[in-house]
Amino acid sequence: MERKRIVSGIRSTGDLHIGHYLGVLKNWVELQKEYQCFYFIADWHALTSEYRDPSIIRKSAKDMVMVWLSVGIDPAQSVIFRQSDVKAHAELFLLLSMITPLSWLERNPTYKEMKEELKEKDLSTFGFLGYPVLQAADIVLYHADKVPIGEDQLPHLELTREIARRFNFIYGEGILKEPKEILTEAARVLGIDGRKMSKSYGNALFIYETGETLKQKVMNMLTDVKRMRKRDPGEPMDCNLYPLHEYFTPEEMRAEIRTGCRSAGLGCVECKQILLTNLIREFEPIWKKIDYYNEHAGI
């Protein structure tokens, strides 16, 4: 039986962080076992915010592919490509933009959110307003059956379906496929300062860090504000650190951390050292593979 088709991409705007690893890449690795997967470097999408310095996009694209390969994205199982190498993305974007009402774009619930997150950049451009149309083109171009997304991205996919539906109504039924969602669990991790983990905020733990840099970041992470001193009891669920333990620390050890935090038997520094050890254990094999691809980039 022919496998269902999936399309997904990541903007090449900088280094990938642990949120990408947990929320996207680990899902991609599993999905490629069951679906026909098309994974792409969204370099045209990256231009919506990085148009003043495209060198960032070029470097990020290369680094991104090395990370993808190192975490387990297999070119023998998945199609990996750069968006700008397939000109049909731009052609279909142009055609879809002709039939997409402006009001559909203006009501996009993440438009204001992204403008706030990237407020240091000038995003008063047609490209930024119209990026959901390019996103729709990316998906329907490949007749994708499904798209892996988090719950917060459902409005984007619904807009893609609306655009495809309108196109088919005008030009003929069945031309464009309306994709369905595969809901993936969003990574519940925060940055070192307690805000959403983001390259833009400068608070991210990146997938490819030196051990020393990672140590410095982990040791500077905010913890439960109630724990001003080691002898003060805390609550793991109120700590920025604990969600990372849920992903990288075995349950038996997590139980000890919860007990130790609530009884003040375990200090925050010790808790951070445990997390650091587990992060290094998880990512050290990935770092070695990235180093290999860096050394053999010409092959």
Enumerate the predicted regions with their spans.
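Short helix-capping/linker segments at secondary-structure and domain boundaries
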Residues: T100-E106, L141-P148, T249-I257, P285-W287
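Classical nucleotidyltransferase
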Residues: E91-F93, S103, R107-E116, E120-I170, ...
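Divalent metal-coordination and catalytic microenvironments
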Residues: W68, L96, D152, G194, ...
